[in-house]
Amino acid sequence: MAAAADLAQIPDVDIDSDGVFKYVLIRVHAVSPPGTPAGESKEIVRGYKWAEYHADIYDKVSGEMQKKGIDCECLGGGRISHQSQDKKIHVYGYSMGYGRAQHSISTEKIKARYPDYSVTWADDGY
């Protein structure tokens, strides 16, 4: 069974270094025995250029988490524009399948991972 320490080992943010790509906001939590309260959880951001669909990212991440004994749920998706040369990241849009992620949460996570970047978000666009 996964513990809070296992959650701490999971990076909050893993996104590609350049380009415009899809991303998902995922809540990960330790699997708790039936009838017991849910354990600790946290949100993670994952975004990759290789993903044609938001579900491609979630399927890959959820498979990796299950192997570690960690449950997860997709909270929504969107797009990320990452310009590493200009140190800019913009989070926007939504996922047709999962709906719009709370970009404000994603942005806070990204700001912590890239403290010297200008990180912005908007609910518009696709």
UniProtKB/Swiss-Prot annotation:
Q: Where is the active site?
A: H54
In the record, biological process GO terms are: positive regulation of cell motility
What is the catalytic activity of this protein?
A: N(pros)-phospho-L-histidyl-[protein] + H2O = L-histidyl-[protein] + phosphate; N(tele)-phospho-L-histidyl-[protein] + H2O = L-histidyl-[protein] + phosphate
Under Enzyme Commission nomenclature, its number is 3.9.1.3
Top-rank taxon? Eukaryota
**Which key words tag this protein in UniProt?**
Cytoplasm, Hydrolase, Protein phosphatase
For this UniProt entry, what is the primary localization, expressed as one broad class? cytoplasm
In its keyword annotation, does this UniProt entry include Cytoplasm? yes
The entry marks the following residues as binding substrate, namely K22, S95, M96, G97
What molecular function terms (GO) are annotated for this protein?
A: protein histidine phosphatase activity
Q: Does the keyword Hydrolase apply?
A: yes
Its cellular-component GO annotations read:
cytosol
Give the UniProt subcellular location, in the record's own words. Cytoplasm
Pfam family of the protein (one): Ocnus
What PANTHER family does its record include? Answer: 14 KDA PHOSPHOHISTIDINE PHOSPHATASE, JANUS-A/JANUS-B
Q: Which family does it belong to?
A: Belongs to the janus family.
Its function, per the record, reads: Exhibits phosphohistidine phosphatase activity.
Q: How does it assemble?
A: Monomer.
Its name, as the record gives it, is 14 kDa phosphohistidine phosphatase
Q: Which organism is it from?
A: Sus scrofa (Pig)
